[in-house]
């Protein structure tokens, strides 16, 4: 069994997820996890797929030749060693928006705390 991370980006339209899932299932793949969104008329997503080793090459070929109108990148992943002594934090920051706010926050997290950002969601609320 092989695992792949697949990223997609393109103009949003009906049928994109259906098209991706059809390619995956036709190659005996299992859609494990995903995060997909539509922003400003664009569709972006990342998903994890498991596929039998014997079908891996055909899956990547089919994804690369798909006529879905998406930019698709497919990369094989290896098992990740999760350290049990790593601490997780959930940070919620509410404040006035200004240029560089994410840069300042990420600098503190990376350089001062050696923290890894695993998920980031931002929005401006009027």
Region locations from a protein language model:
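A conserved regulatory-domain signal marking ACT and ACT-like small-molecule sensing domains
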Residues: 1-126
């Amino acid at each position: 069994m092989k695992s792949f991370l697949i990223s997609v980006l393109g103009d949003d339209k009906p049928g994109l997820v259906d098209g991706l899932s059809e390619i995956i299932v036709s190659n005996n793949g299992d859609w494990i996890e995903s995060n997909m969104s539509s922003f400003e008329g664009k569709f972006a997503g990342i998903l994890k797929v498991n596929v039998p080793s014997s079908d891996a090459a055909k899956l990547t070929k089919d994804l690369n030749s798909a006529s879905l109108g998406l930019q698709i990148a497919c990369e094989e992943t290896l098992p990740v060693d999760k350290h049990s002594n790593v601490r997780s934090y959930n940070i919620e920051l509410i404040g006035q928006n200004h240029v560089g706010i994410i840069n300042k926050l990420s600098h503190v997290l990376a350089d001062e705390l050696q923290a890894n950002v695993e998920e980031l969601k931002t929005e401006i609320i009027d």
